[in-house]
Amino acid sequence: EFTISFSSPVISTGQHIDVGDEDYHDGDDDVDYTDDVDDVDDSHGSPSQLLQGGYQRNQHYGGGNYQSGYYRPNKQHGNGYGGQYPKKYGSGHKY
């Protein structure tokens, strides 16, 4: 019957959202939710996808909500807004 482990809290999204070692660095490495969104949508995903990925991914940043993932402008393919936010915003998970 059910073989899904409850240790995989994001399995229901159908997106590839790891919570492995690459995910809790500084949030600025190239393996983060933006790549997972790109797996689903060759553009940059809808804001809802980004919010979903950011929220779930940042559960283990220590209490950050979806903003932790959503405002991460210093990515080369970014959050779907073409990097219009200045780099000074830095890594979103510091919110």
UniProtKB/Swiss-Prot annotation:
Coiled coil regions, renumbered to chain: none
Domain of life: Eukaryota
UniProt-annotated stretches for the region Disordered: 1-95
Feature: compositional bias, Acidic residues: 20-41
Polar residues biased stretches: 1-15, 45-59
Family: Belongs to the immunogenic miracidial antigen family.
Protein name listed in UniProt: Immunogenic miracidial antigen 8C
Species this protein is from: Schistosoma japonicum
Gene: 8C
